[in-house]
């Protein structure tokens, strides 16, 4: 009877190797040693951990929208931490417009590394003008430098009516014209076989430095003084308007390092502070010396006053008594009785001796002495006794004054 090839129970000789491997695997499984309990627990824990990992990863995979093709999906890249915008602190008594200028330069124009130098109190003032505030900033490139300076000048003219003189700024079309002319010169040199100049040449295109000088802006109400106000008959150059000069120095990074204005003006400020400190110390020492001398003189003066509580100087009494006599003989044509003379002498002596010598004017003393001397030289007096007395007392006055 022929074997049916379609009957599954019939063994096919072509696939005999399958039966041998199956049998061998079965025999091997029967001959293996039994699995320990520890291995069973380990396999169970590993399986549970894999299940938890797959369950945790399932929401992430489900979160991805499969309707968007892979080439349109946006993978959030790790962005670099941006540096916060740093605006320098305002100096004491700042102009009202200074904060607006700093915010525009830093935020709108996008210049970096701002530094503010307060040069308002420099003596003598800088060449850029008295009461100067200097701002130094860095641009990212040559093009950024010119765009920022041009926008800054237009902003000041449009918003605040200020005219900024931007030295080194190239206009919007001027840069293209200069580059075209430079390329044309290079082509001409190449055609005639000339060598192209090498090195960092100043061709007037790459400046790397723009100095924006603002016109005077309004000063703080507490900062309205002018240089030389405390000097009588001031001689020199200064502006009458009590404003503040602001200068913005814009650099590329390489040019700023090369120029190094911070070190220059920082040294000037340090020198002025050092000189001011030395002057203040000297004034303080001088004040202390004066106070010490005054404190030492006070007990000495009080001691001298205690010791000199005596009557007035005899010379002073002689002088003022002789001045009283001149009232008796100030008019040679007038006759006085003895009673009148005695009363006048008593009144004038009491009045004059009750005052100090400093209370009388020098002109009065000189006039009185002149009249006494005139009487001494021979003016006629009615009574001989009075004449001799007047001459003797006039001699005493002249001797005391000598």
UniProtKB/Swiss-Prot annotation:
Compositionally biased region (Low complexity): 44-58
Major localization listed first in the record, in broad terms: mitochondrion
Cellular component aspect of the GO annotation: mitochondrial inner membrane
BP-aspect Gene Ontology terms: mitochondrial gene expression
Localization in the cell: Mitochondrion inner membrane
Annotated membrane topology: Peripheral membrane protein
Keyword Transcription set for record: no
Extent of the transit peptide: 1-32
Protein family per UniProt: Belongs to the ATP25 family.
Designated name of the protein: ATPase synthesis protein 25, mitochondrial
Native organism: Phaeosphaeria nodorum (strain SN15 / ATCC MYA-4574 / FGSC 10173) (Glume blotch fungus)
Lineage, highest ranks first: Eukaryota, Fungi, Dikarya, Ascomycota, Pezizomycotina
